[in-house]
């Protein structure tokens, strides 16, 4: 009995000590209260700069979802050679490095060009997140003189909307040696920046009867690409973040030209079928393209049914003319971007091929 009592007394003592420690704690008396630190930022207010009751961001996302940037599907081209323009991740990486030729590595989980490609989304969490990710002048890769664009905000577009030098190697020189080229030689896509900048930008300016000068679209339109392709939006069909210049009528078949970005200069112009053919520019250019194509086919430099070239060895001047054809055909505006320059290239090229 005495033994049990001793055990009980010992356990009780341990419990009492533990209880005292629980309420008293092991720390000593606290020191003086320190100075109040700076107030933290209001997270709700910061996020609310963009995430608010406005539907502006949502509207632009909807426009983007209808754009070729979103639907083109080319972001599968995530290799080092293609990712710099076909994926968001590749573009940001090459822009940061200053080398737009190749991404540093194969892009895992690639995404198409999106908000984060052209803007600094979620970097400062304020309105500066919507500033263009770059507006620096862009060196044109096919220019032998190191020409750069001066498109202001449109410089962002010029980074990718230009042909790569690798596609026009060997590069033709005036009256140079014969050149051996492969079937896919030449600027086959995205030549807009070269045509828009015009004189001295990398096209083969073979001498001829027509002087090489630029049109007002090249020299006077502010921000170049942005003014026309991002004009006040028409729902999700044209302008704004669709970047589209055409839209379909309610029949789903008839294609209309969207001229909201043109009317500041071309007063009275209205959207509709064939409205870009001001002063018959497109009609004239399409006729000249057809003439030059026929001459290149006759010279066995171009496939008879496609715009794919034919491998072979040809005079340097004629190789340069083939480059002109591919630059203009791939550019897609049928002369609108720079009418005077394009007509000079075509007419002088045609005259030379007829010799």
Language-model features: locations:
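Sequence context of c-type cytochrome heme-c attachment sites
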Residues: 26-152, 159-254, 328
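Mature extracytoplasmic or organellar-lumen-exposed domains after removal of signal/transit peptides
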Residues: 267-355
């Amino acid at each position: 009995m005495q033994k049990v009592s001793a055990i009980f007394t010992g356990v009780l003592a341990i419990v009492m000590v533990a209880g005292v420690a629980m309420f008293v704690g092991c720390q000593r008396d606290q020191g003086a209260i320190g100075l109040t630190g700076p107030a933290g930022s209001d997270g709700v207010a910061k996020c609310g700069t963009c995430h608010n009751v406005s539907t502006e961001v949502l509207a632009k996302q909807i426009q983007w979802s209808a754009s070729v940037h979103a639907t083109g599907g080319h972001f599968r081209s995530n290799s080092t050679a293609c990712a710099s323009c076909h994926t968001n991740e590749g573009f940001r990486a090459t822009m940061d490095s200053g080398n737009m030729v190749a991404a540093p590595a194969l892009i895992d989980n690639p995404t198409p060009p999106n908000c984060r490609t052209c803007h600094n989304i979620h970097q400062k969490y304020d309105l500066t997140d919507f500033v263009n990710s770059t507006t620096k002048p862009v060196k044109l890769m096919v220019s032998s003189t190191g020409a750069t664009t001066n498109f202001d905000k449109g410089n962002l577009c010029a980074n990718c909307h230009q042909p790569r030098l690798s596609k026009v190697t060997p590069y033709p020189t005036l009256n140079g040696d014969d050149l051996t080229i492969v079937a896919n030689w030449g600027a086959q896509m995205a030549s807009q920046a070269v045509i828009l900048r015009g004189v001295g930008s990398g096209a083969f300016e073979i001498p001829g009867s027509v002087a090489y000068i630029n049109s007002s679209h090249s020299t006077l339109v502010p921000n170049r690409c942005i003014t026309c392709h991002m004009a006040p939006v028409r729902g999700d069909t044209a302008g704004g973040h669709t970047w589209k210049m055409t839209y379909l009528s309610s029949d789903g078949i008839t294609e209309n030209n969207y001229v909201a970005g043109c009317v500041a200069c071309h007063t009275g112009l209205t959207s509709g079928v064939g409205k870009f053919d001001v002063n018959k520019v497109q009609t004239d250019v399409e006729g000249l393209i057809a003439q030059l194509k026929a001459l290149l086919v006759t010279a066995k430099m171009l496939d008879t049914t496609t715009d794919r070239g034919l491998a072979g060895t040809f005079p340097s001047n004629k190789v340069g003319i083939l480059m002109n054809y591919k630059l203009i055909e791939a550019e897609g505006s049928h002369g609108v971007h720079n009418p005077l320059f394009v007509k000079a290239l075509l007419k002088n090229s045609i005259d030379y091929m007829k010799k």
